[in-house]
């Protein structure tokens, strides 16, 4: 419980009902991943309203599918591509649809679909996030973040590089 409280913001600690936090605490699959607290247990994906969705997914996702998706998260990406229709016109205010609502309706705007994917992945024990700088949806596989592109045919591996800056001081006038 302390780990969960440590990963959410102080505002979420104050504003989120205990029932929501208990749902995430009691229904998050255990993992020895170093990413567990931040990217599996954490109920916060983006700026959505926090809801108790993990118990719902625990009872509504087929266990065989859950195992298959955990072994290969690309299976989950493909399922979301095939099963969730995108209709941005239905949400002109851009208020995030709750993950359970996306599951039941099978329709979402792009942002709600992205939050849904991360929420469902985390519910299955897959480390996932919306990358904070570029806002890319990603899951972690074998220690590497993999970009999720719902339009592409294959997963996109995040490219890493190294930036070196040097500075040579000059005398001031």
Please report, for each region that a protein language model flagged, where it lies by residue.
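Short, conserved phosphate-binding/catalytic loop or strand-edge motifs used
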Residues: 92-99
């Amino acid at each position: 419980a302390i780990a969960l409280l440590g990963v959410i913001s102080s505002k979420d600690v104050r504003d989120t009902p205990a029932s929501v936090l208990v749902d995430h605490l009691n229904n998050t699959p255990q993992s020895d991943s170093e990413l567990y607290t931040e990217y599996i247990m954490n109920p916060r994906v983006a700026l959505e309203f926090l809801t108790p969705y993990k118990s719902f997914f625990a009872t509504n996702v087929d266990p065989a599918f859950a195992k298959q998706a955990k072994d290969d998260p690309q299976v989950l990406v493909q399922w979301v591509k095939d099963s969730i229709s995108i209709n941005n016109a239905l949400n002109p205010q851009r208020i995030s649809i709750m993950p359970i609502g996306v599951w039941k309706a099978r329709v979402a705007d792009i942002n709600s679909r992205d939050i849904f994917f991360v929420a469902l992945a985390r519910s299955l024990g897959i480390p996932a996030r919306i990358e904070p700088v570029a806002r890319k949806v990603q899951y972690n596989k074998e220690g590497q973040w993999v970009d999720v592109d719902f339009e592409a045919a294959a997963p996109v591996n995040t490219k890493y590089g190294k930036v070196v800056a040097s500075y040579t001081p000059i005398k001031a006038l």
